[in-house]
Amino acid sequence: MKSAGVYPASNQEIYSGLVRIHILYHACQGPIFGLGMIEELRRHGYRLSAGTLYPLLHGLETKGYLRSREVRSGRTFRRFYRATAAGHKALALAREKVKELVGELLEDD
């Protein structure tokens, strides 16, 4: 995951998982598109390029968590992604795991 120097390279795999959860969350809320997700993730402190985000989106689609379709926008096309039933189920499971983890992390404080 390319992060423009914000995170050490050794943490990229960890942050990649968090980014995937963010993507699933927003795709469960409604249709998302690449640039919109880059901007949304930036609000949370992630610095992703299109070259990093699109492979993540395509990977989630290949695994059946997202479905996409192209929509014409003027002279160009924009690909929108939505969560599938499997994506909703995966997010529900991730939510439970994150709750459990946050509970453990906060116990140590």
Locations of regions flagged by a protein language model:
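Histidine- and aromatic-rich ligand-binding microenvironments
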Residues: 70, 75-78, 99-102
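Basic amphipathic alpha-helical segments that dock to polyanions
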Residues: 53-55, 59-60
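Beta-hairpin "wing" of winged helix-turn-helix
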Residues: 63-74, 82
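Basic, amphipathic "hinge/linker" alpha-helix immediately C-terminal to the N-terminal HTH DNA-binding motif
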Residues: 77-95
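Short, Lys/Arg-enriched N-terminal segment that forms or immediately precedes the first helix
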Residues: 1-12
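Amphipathic alpha-helical dimerization/coiled-coil segments
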Residues: 91-109
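N-terminal helix-turn-helix DNA-binding core of bacterial DNA-binding proteins
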Residues: 11-52
